[in-house]
A protein has these predicted regions:
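Hydrophobic structural segments
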Residues: 1-258
Length: 258
């Protein structure tokens, strides 16, 4: 059977640790050791995801967001790392290194929009390139449809909520950066983008981007990042044919949208 360490080595090849931001905490964050025959890929490690992994007999969860980020001062039954150890489940978390990696979060996101002549921006994290000419409302609708089809469906409300600030300019050059990337609009402008598609952007990001001639689409943190879980699962299946790799069905957007 496959060991946790073997999967960790494979994940380091997929998302090299040197690509991570200095403030980040990627890696093998919970190591219960041993061998396993089943792995769960998820965006976040929540109590629901730990329960799912235990129910499905997964000895390891591979996630995007680190289950330990800030230094731990105490730990108890309500804390996810405690729950993982109690269940004997290890956790490998690849965060900003997976954002920047080839075939990682942002290349998966770019691929959804058939991006051509792809380049990096935002210190290698984001992707920018050519797409078929499209209006911002049309692009926002496509984002909502395509991302929803790749995410776990919520119990109530729509799967994806998209908002946009439209300059009225046709989008031919698109920049994408998943998650909380709204503050990077000036980096997108510097790369000649007509529009930045990200997960989260605040009020002032939208005002300033539009004033500077850049349209902005915010399609949700969860929605812009969850699609990478299927890509990671497929890479692990290729690397370990004997390993059953599942994509979490209980990892959902924490928000409910009206």
């Amino acid at each position: 059977m496959t060991t946790v360490r073997q999967v960790y080595e494979a994940m380091q090849a997929i998302a090299p640790l040197e690509l991570a931001e200095h403030w980040d905490n990627p890696g093998l964050l919970v190591d219960c050791g041993g061998q396993m025959h089943r792995v769960l890929a998820a965006l976040d490690i929540t109590p629901e995801v730990v329960e799912e992994a235990a129910r499905k007999g997964c000895g390891l969860i591979v996630s995007h967001h680190p289950v330990i980020f800030d230094p731990l001062k105490k730990i108890g039954p309500q804390d996810v790392p405690f729950q993982l150890v109690q269940a004997g489940i290890s956790a490998i978390c690849m965060h900003t290194n997976l954002d920047a990696a080839e075939g990682g979060v942002n290349e998966v996101l770019a691929g959804i929009f058939d991006m051509k002549n792809m380049e990096t921006f935002a210190e290698g994290c984001g992707r920018v390139g050519r797409i078929e000419p499209v209006t911002v409302p049309e692009l926002a609708k496509k984002a909502q449809k395509e991302l929803a089809s790749r995410c776990n469906q919520p119990f109530n409300g729509p799967a994806v909520q998209v908002k946009f600030a439209d300059t009225g300019k046709t989008v031919r050059r698109l920049a994408v950066i998943s998650g909380a990337g709204g503050s990077l609009f000036e980096d997108a402008i510097a790369q000649g983008a007509d529009c930045l598609l990200t997960g989260e952007a605040n009020h002032h990001h939208a005002i300033d981007a539009k004033r500077l001639g850049l349209s902005l689409i915010a399609a949700g943190h969860y929605a812009t990042e969850f699609p990478v879980t299927a890509a990671v699962a497929e890479k692990l299946r290729t690397a370990f044919p004997e390993l059953e790799v599942l994509v979490s069905e209980d990892a959902r957007d924490p928000y409910t949208y009206l």
